[in-house]
């Protein structure tokens, strides 16, 4: 039986409940939904990267990347990405940011992806992203 390893990096905010930012079991790594919070600073409440979709999207992608790396993975190991937006009006901008980010990252093959509008994010947050990676 392969051991399950919870991943919560020091750079991330402490989860508000009993969950981790990612879990790896064998060659499978699930990154929990990440939002655009800036890296954790002791004594500071979780702080969004900024009020704009651009700021939050880029920080959210970096937060997903850091969990992938903590689990020994990278973007090319990702099989599925799920994006949750709070406003249908953000689709075009998010797609442009997403495409530019992955072009800059040198992604070889695009993973499957799904974007959903979800209004249940905490106030001020515009985007959440999770990812499923298979290593090897």
Each model region followed by its residue ranges:
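N-terminal presequence-like segments and the immediate start of the first folded domain
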Residues: 1-62, 66-80, 85-136
């Amino acid at each position: 039986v392969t051991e399950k390893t919870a991943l919560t990096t020091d750079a991330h905010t402490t989860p508000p409940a009993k969950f981790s930012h990612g879990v790896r079991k064998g060659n499978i790594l699930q990154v929990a939904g990440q939002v655009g919070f800036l890296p954790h600073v002791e004594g500071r409440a979780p702080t969004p990267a900024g009020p704009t979709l651009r700021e939050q999207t880029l920080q959210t992608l970096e937060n997903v990347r850091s969990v992938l790396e903590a689990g020994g993975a990278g973007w090319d190991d990702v099989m599925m990405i799920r994006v949750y937006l709070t406003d249908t009006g953000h689709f075009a901008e998010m797609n442009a940011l997403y495409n530019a980010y992955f072009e800059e990252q040198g992604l070889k093959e695009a993973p499957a992806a799904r974007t959903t509008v979800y209004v249940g994010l905490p106030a001020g947050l515009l985007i959440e992203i999770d990812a499923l990676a298979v290593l090897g």
